[in-house]
Amino acid sequence: MEKWRIYSFQKEFERRCGLNSSLGPIETTGEDPNRKDTVKNIQSWEDCDNSSCSNVDHLFGVKDNENFISDDTFVVFDIENQIFEIDNDHSFLNEPFSSYSDRNSSYLTNVFTSEDPYYNRYMYDAQYSWNNHINGCIDSYLQSQICIDTTTVSGSDNDSYDIHGSVCDGESHNSSEGESSSRRTHTKGVDLTIRESSNENERESSNENERKSSNDLDRTKKYRDLWLQCENCYGLNYKKFLKSKMNICEQCGYHLKMSSSDRIELLIDPGTWDPMDEYMVSQDPIEFDSEGEQEQEQEQEQEEEETYKDRIDFYQTKTGLTEAVQTGIGQLNGIPVAIGVMDFHFLGGSMGSVVGEKITRLIEHATNNFLPLIIVCASGGARMQEGSLSLMQMAKISSALYEYQLNKRLFYVSILTSPTTGGVTASFGMLGDVIIVEPNAYVAFAGKRVIEQTLNQTVPEGSQEAEYLFEKGLFDLIVPRHLLKSVLSELFEFHALFPLNQNSNQVEC
């Protein structure tokens, strides 16, 4: 059982937040000289032979305090049994009193005991309320002076205290040096206990966060097919509504990737689409996954388990397409056009021998039938699995366009979407009579990662986007997706390409 001395009632008090300015911190001994004869030994927390005392003054204000005068008041802590009591020589807390006036409101009422089951200790028990008030004051003082958090200074009820803590600078005033060292040793032990408990709390919180993240991941996998995340703002867009919104993000207006079939529906009048060469498929012309290469490049095969043919079959099943481009004839607001639309969802829209052949045949058909030509580009470049055959498509398509544009004087519109890179940018992507680009489209010859790894230089942000390149004169128009069809129609009419129902005798440019 340990006692702390508190001189509380000498005169009318004023409400204070801390100790009296005349008193030092809790580490120093400040005894009233007039009360030296009544000073009692206050046993240490650890050594019963040593003593330590401190005066706590001006904790709260009292207006009517005639009945509360006391010379010696002790705060008694029983740490083992977790008991907090007030020991007073005059036992004034056990005597009935009329009123206790606080600065804000009356705090205590008349004292009486009751056996009623609905008896409220806070309302009718003056000693309990007094203890509760003292506890709150000491709690505030300990937190400000001894740096003990509310999580470490707590009680199961307001009348019992369990104190675990340490002084800020690891010191506490005692009557001897030995007791001081003993106190510091005890403080270190308590600090260790606090750190261990905090580590346990951190581990519990981290485990809880891991469980929450795993649950979120499971939900994400479960509903992944219902939502599409924006590449720009990372907002979620409901897939069923995307098609009606032309694959434009609802949050930021960013133009998301669009399948070739959706683009055909966007540009071509309903019921006028006539596909060309839709059954032409790739046959692995250079045998990219031959046995000789497998023996020489075993490490690469471990990383890429699927062969080129397997990947072709996979994307054919996933997209419902035979290759990375769709070509055909249709009408745009009644104007007959030859159009080719690349699909980035099929092997990144890479250009292989089949893609090059289909585009070349489309250009030749438009040349022979005097049709305007539209090619929508969305590609990562030449297809590496076909080697030099894929690079050859650049020259083949460019030769067909030379005949179409220069010899026949026909009109070719190139539409660049995100991303358009590599061999497509270096060939037919930039050969249009009018080059249109979508907002924020990524257009480049070599990607940012390739440039930085090759030249060991940082590529500035935004230097390969449509707006920056448009300022440099690389494109003619930046057209949002919802205005694209009307802009194309006006361009064709400007070049004397009218709908069939208005003028049967079309004049070719």
UniProtKB/Swiss-Prot annotation:
Record-level GO cellular component terms: acetyl-CoA carboxylase complex; chloroplast stroma
Single GO biological process annotation from the record: malonyl-CoA biosynthetic process
Origin superkingdom: Eukaryota
PROSITE patterns membership: COA_CT_NTER (PS50980)
Cofactor: how bound: Binds 1 zinc ion per subunit.
Co-factor(s): Zn(2+)
Organism: Ipomoea purpurea (Common morning glory)
NCBIfam families per UniProt: accD
Known partners and oligomeric status: Acetyl-CoA carboxylase is a heterohexamer composed of biotin carboxyl carrier protein, biotin carboxylase and 2 subunits each of ACCase subunit alpha and ACCase plastid-coded subunit beta (accD).
Keywords, in A-Z order: ATP-binding, Chloroplast, Fatty acid biosynthesis, Fatty acid metabolism, Lipid biosynthesis, Lipid metabolism, Metal-binding, Nucleotide-binding, Plastid, Transferase, Zinc, Zinc-finger
Compositional bias per record (Basic and acidic residues), positions renumbered to this chain: 170-182, 193-216
Enzyme Commission number, as recorded: 2.1.3.15
Reactions catalysed: N(6)-carboxybiotinyl-L-lysyl-[protein] + acetyl-CoA = N(6)-biotinyl-L-lysyl-[protein] + malonyl-CoA
Protein purpose: Component of the acetyl coenzyme A carboxylase (ACC) complex. Biotin carboxylase (BC) catalyzes the carboxylation of biotin on its carrier protein (BCCP) and then the CO(2) group is transferred by the transcarboxylase to acetyl-CoA to form malonyl-CoA.
Keyword hit for Zinc: yes
GO MF entries: acetyl-CoA carboxylase activity; ATP binding; carboxyl- or carbamoyltransferase activity; zinc ion binding
Residues involved in Zn(2+) binding: C230, C233, C249, C252
Gene: accD
Zinc fingers classed as C4-type: ranges: 230-252
Family recorded in the similarity comment: Belongs to the AccD/PCCB family.
The keyword Transmembrane helix appears for this protein: no
UniProt name for this protein: Acetyl-coenzyme A carboxylase carboxyl transferase subunit beta, chloroplastic
Protein location: Plastid, Chloroplast stroma
